[in-house]
């Protein structure tokens, strides 16, 4: 019954996109996991903003783009914009089974561009664990759980993602990669490498051109993390003010996690539980 419900509208497309679970080469740059993060607040009815979240597996590089609704065309345009900003070639993209991604438009695009396209197993969120982690540390922990559904909010979120949040996370927030996981007497022991930023991992990968390296170095030298942090806080304050103005003051839930704020901790790549404080 679940199979019929899930694939009944267009079963052939699910046969075109192979299922992939855990078999990733974590040293190969260009494998991108994609996902949608809903900003619907306490109600999923009506039209609201969604964040298209993209995480590169080998380096932890992240990009985001906000869209109104879940339309396939808007989601596709967001993905192409993100791909244009990426400082590496996309070799493969991997999504869950959301119809915003599982459609012929994206399948044909992947074929035309020579990009692999795979999907998670049904009801197995851990198959998309890299981007799921970024959804928490980069999206939810930053802009909260409020409902955003206006063009003004959409403009602020996109400006935040492109101009401040992505540079701040990619160039200045180190993450640790899981090197080894061993089971000893029924207990799992994990070993991690030295914390590095996605920028550092990309520069050390040996998989980007010298021209791209110089461009990234120039961007890095032009950035000031303290200034980025101030701008992030300023835009989050503006986003909160627009939300209050839209709904009327005093109507916001007291649930603390709903309110947007910036997270200045770095996180372990593919370990969803342990934050590493930046000193």
Model-identified regions with their sequence ranges:
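Short, flexible loop/turn elements at secondary-structure junctions
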Residues: 36-40, 56-58, 69-71, 97-99
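RNase H-like two-metal-ion nuclease catalytic core shared by retroviral integrases
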Residues: 95-97, 101-110, 117-143, 156-158, ...
């Amino acid at each position: 019954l679940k199979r019929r419900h899930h694939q009944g509208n267009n079963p052939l497309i699910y046969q075109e996109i192979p299922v992939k679970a855990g078999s990733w080469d974590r040293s190969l740059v260009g494998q991108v996991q994609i996902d949608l993060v809903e900003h619907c607040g306490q109600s999923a009815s009506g039209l609201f903003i969604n964040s298209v979240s993209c995480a590169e597996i080998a380096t932890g590089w992240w990009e985001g783009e906000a869209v109104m609704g879940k339309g396939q065309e808007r989601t596709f345009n967001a993905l192409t914009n993100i791909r244009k900003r990426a400082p590496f070639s996309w070799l493969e993209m991997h999504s869950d089974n959301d119809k915003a991604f599982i459609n012929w438009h994206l399948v044909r695009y992947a074929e035309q561009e020579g990009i692999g396209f795979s999907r998670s197993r049904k009801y197995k969120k851990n198959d998309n664990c890299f981007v799921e982690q970024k959804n928490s540390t980069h999206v939810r922990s930053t802009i909260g759980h409020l409902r955003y559904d206006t063009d003004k909010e959409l403009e602020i979120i996109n400006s935040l993602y492109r101009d401040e949040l992505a540079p701040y996370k990619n160039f200045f927030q180190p993450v640790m990669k899981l090197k080894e996981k061993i089971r000893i007497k029924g207990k799992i022991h994990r070993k991690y490498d030295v914390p590095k930023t996605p920028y550092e991992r990309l520069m050390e990968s040996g998989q980007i051109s010298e021209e791209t390296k110089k461009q990234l170095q120039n961007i890095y030298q032009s950035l000031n993390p303290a200034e980025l942090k101030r701008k992030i806080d300023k835009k989050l304050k503006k986003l909160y003010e627009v939300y209050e103005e839209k709904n009327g003051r005093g109507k916001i839930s007291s649930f603390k996690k709903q309110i947007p704020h910036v997270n200045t901790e770095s996180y372990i790549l593919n370990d969803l539980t342990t934050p590493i404080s930046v000193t």
